Amino acid sequence: MMFKNFPFFKGKKDTSFDHLVEEVKKGYIPEHIAIIMDGNGRWAKRRAMPRIAGHHEGMQVVKKITKFASKLNVKVLTLYAFSTENWKRPKKEVDYLMKLPEEFLGTFLPELIEENVQVRVIGQKDRLPTHTRRAMEKAMEDTKENTGLILNFALNYGSRDEIVSAVQHMMKDNEEGKIRSEEVSEEMLSSYLMTSSLPDPELLIRTSGELRISNFMLWQIAYSEFWFTDVYWPDFKEEHLLNAITDFQHRGRRFGGV
């Protein structure tokens, strides 16, 4: 079942936010949270601003949510930053989006290192501009020994493409005698995905009021809890993430059982 902005904190105005955080941390925190960051363009349009202004503001929210997820002891935070379909957007917007990782990491990387955050990237990196790849590679290299939160960017990522690529690699290994067809299993296919070293997301969040998955981690979210909110990504705050996690904690996850 899916909820929007379920008001678990209604009536608790006299309670400090820090106290609420500590209360939530006493419950089970999802190991892996994935977020479809949506609504940057519409946020800007409502303010008569260019779409790129929304993307810039959205990156500031990434900083806040990353720090807060780390504080909550979330182990993996995957952010859908740019899909394989996003190349269809206006060139000016795409060019700006390709510059954002360099701008973002140029200022935020020292804090990520200090916070013990490890940066990873999934997606088709070969199509990314050189300056974008270099920024991501530097961040991954500089944080590879960090043992805290894994900040995983899905950049030029499409789930169908990921699954097709995994099957192609499995077929190649089968032809070379590395695996036998009777050995193929869900676990084996998972091991060929870009997320093979990560747990599957337990909680998937999408902002902006859209109720779809948009070709994001289709295999990995088979048993994820979905949480949708009408809030645009630039307006997404720590309180919203805490609300989503509290909602998650109140759900019964039966995985097909009783």
Swiss-Prot record:
SUPFAM superfamilies: Undecaprenyl diphosphate synthase
Keywords carried by this UniProt record: Magnesium, Metal-binding, Transferase
Entry note: cofactor: Binds 2 magnesium ions per subunit.
Cofactor dependence: Mg(2+)
Residues that coordinate or bind substrate: 39-43, 51, 55, 83-85, 87, 89, 206, 212-214
Pfam families associated with the record: Prenyltransf
Binding site for Mg(2+): 38, 225
GO molecular function: ditrans,polycis-undecaprenyl-diphosphate synthase [(2E,6E)-farnesyl-diphosphate specific] activity; magnesium ion binding; manganese ion binding
Family per record: Belongs to the UPP synthase family.
Function: Catalyzes the condensation of isopentenyl diphosphate (IPP) with allylic pyrophosphates generating different type of terpenoids.
Protein name: Isoprenyl transferase
